[in-house]
């Protein structure tokens, strides 16, 4: 395939690319690390306000990251109205509020699934607090990821833990406003090693179906066993109208939270192909595209710029798949021809097309180069001196 230009895209595909947005995680800008060490970065934000300043920088140079996810209590402030105004003044909306029931001593044996009713009540109360914060900042979604599970057979009743989870989720869901939704994330292991209470998309889906139409599944690309066909899961959840959001990242071994597309760009393309094929890239599709990453070694803002442009490149390639040729090859059972159509799109260099798109939007065609030349990193390194840098509370 020759190098395409923006004009080679059909008007609908061009519009989808122009309106694509990706939500950034506030915690990606703070100091983070592995279970062995949290590494520090000069100029790391010290509070949620400075995190939002950094989010705004990514959006200023990519044009596709106008929202931020908050994590409570990492992003607790005294005045949420002030935080919302601070974000709005920088062109940033608050998209998702993430709960945290995995860093309190009381949650040693679980949170929403804990056998102790008092601890379950505490975990539910935290989610109700998150819903209040959603109202204050105008966030439409509550995202729940649970570390709940067991390490040894016999430690607790698997069935009873599911019953407790269903009851806890029902209480949280009932507290949502009519314009708010709940998205439930799954992870196949870690930190629980015998069984995890929400280990897979089927478990998340079962609970969401029981809750109601405003409960949907979050798919974190790093939360699967090696070799899992993630695009198959994407297709199934889209068929059912229950794919609520992505947490994009990359992994080599487990939940590595590396830059999306770094380990397997072909997988990212295959995922975005299912999104495009199902019409789920449209802004009103109900699918929220988010990043969930920790930049342990690299600079935070450049890492998020690279991540956003990686998703954008995979999307552009998916939009270039020749659907007519693909359908024709499938209709006659021409396996290699169908695969060729697919691979041709993946192997296309879409960087010139995206540079053209950015120029048409008044942006620099090379967002990474432009950001590094802006002097912002040097400025925050000199200005953000004193105080405690934001982190993940580990």
List PLM regions with ranges.
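Histidine-acidic metal/acid-base catalytic patches
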Residues: 1-29, 37-40, 56, 154, ...
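Active-site acidic/histidine proton-transfer and metal-coordination neighborhood
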Residues: 6-16, 94, 106-212, 216, ...
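Catalytic domains of carbohydrate-active enzymes, especially glycoside hydrolases
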Residues: 15-24, 28, 41-74
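Short, acidic/polar
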Residues: 41-58, 124-132, 227-236
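Glycine-rich, aromatic-flanked loop segments that form ligand/cofactor-binding clefts
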Residues: 19-29, 72-102, 133
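N-terminal small/glycine-rich loop or linker at the start of catalytic domains
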Residues: 20-39, 100-114, 146-152
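Active-site-proximal loop/turn and secondary-structure-junction residues that shape catalytic pockets
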Residues: 28-30, 72-76, 98-103, 146-150, ...
């Amino acid at each position: 395939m020759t190098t395409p230009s923006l004009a080679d895209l059909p008007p609908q595909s061009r519009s989808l690319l122009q309106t694509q947005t990706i939500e950034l995680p506030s915690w990606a800008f703070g100091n983070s690390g592995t279970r062995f060490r949290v590494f520090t970065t000069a100029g790391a934000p010290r509070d949620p306000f400075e995190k939002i300043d950094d989010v705004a920088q990514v959006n200023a140079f990519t044009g596709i990251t106008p929202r931020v996810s908050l994590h409570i209590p990492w992003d607790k402030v005294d005045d949420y109205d002030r935080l919302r105004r601070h974000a709005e003044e920088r062109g940033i909306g608050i998209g998702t509020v993430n709960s945290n029931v995995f860093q309190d001593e009381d949650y040693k044996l679980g949170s929403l699934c804990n056998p102790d009713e008092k601890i379950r009540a505490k975990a539910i109360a935290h989610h109700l607090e998150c819903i209040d914060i959603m109202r204050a900042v105008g966030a439409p979604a509550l995202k729940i990821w649970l570390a709940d599970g067991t390490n040894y057979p016999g430690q607790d009743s698997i069935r009873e833990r599911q019953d407790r989870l269903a009851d806890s989720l029902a209480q949280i869901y009932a507290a949502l406003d009519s314009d708010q939704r709940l998205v439930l994330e799954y992870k196949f292991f870690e930190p629980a090693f015998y069984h995890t209470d929400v280990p897979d998309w089927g478990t998340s889906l079962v609970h969401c179906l029981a809750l109601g139409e405003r409960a949907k599944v979050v798919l974190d690309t790093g939360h699967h066993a090696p070799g899992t066909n993630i695009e198959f899961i994407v297709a199934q959840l889209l068929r059912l109208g229950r794919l609520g959001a992505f947490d994009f990242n990359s992994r080599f071994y487990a939940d590595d939270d590396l830059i999306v597309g770094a380990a397997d760009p072909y997988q990212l393309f295959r995922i975005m192909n299912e999104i495009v094929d199902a019409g789920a890239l449209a802004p009103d599709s109900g699918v929220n595209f988010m990043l969930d990453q920790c930049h342990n070694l690299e600079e935070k803002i450049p890492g998020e710029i690279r991540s956003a442009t990686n998703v954008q490149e995979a999307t552009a390639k998916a939009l270039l798949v020749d659907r007519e040729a693909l359908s024709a090859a499938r209709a006659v059972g021409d396996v290699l021809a169908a695969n060729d159509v697919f691979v041709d799109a993946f192997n296309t260099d879409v960087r010139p097309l995206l540079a053209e798109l950015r120029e048409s939007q008044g942006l620099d065609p090379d967002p990474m180069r432009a950001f590094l030349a802006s002097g912002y990193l040097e400025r925050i390194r000199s200005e953000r001196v004193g105080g405690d840098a934001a982190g993940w509370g580990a």
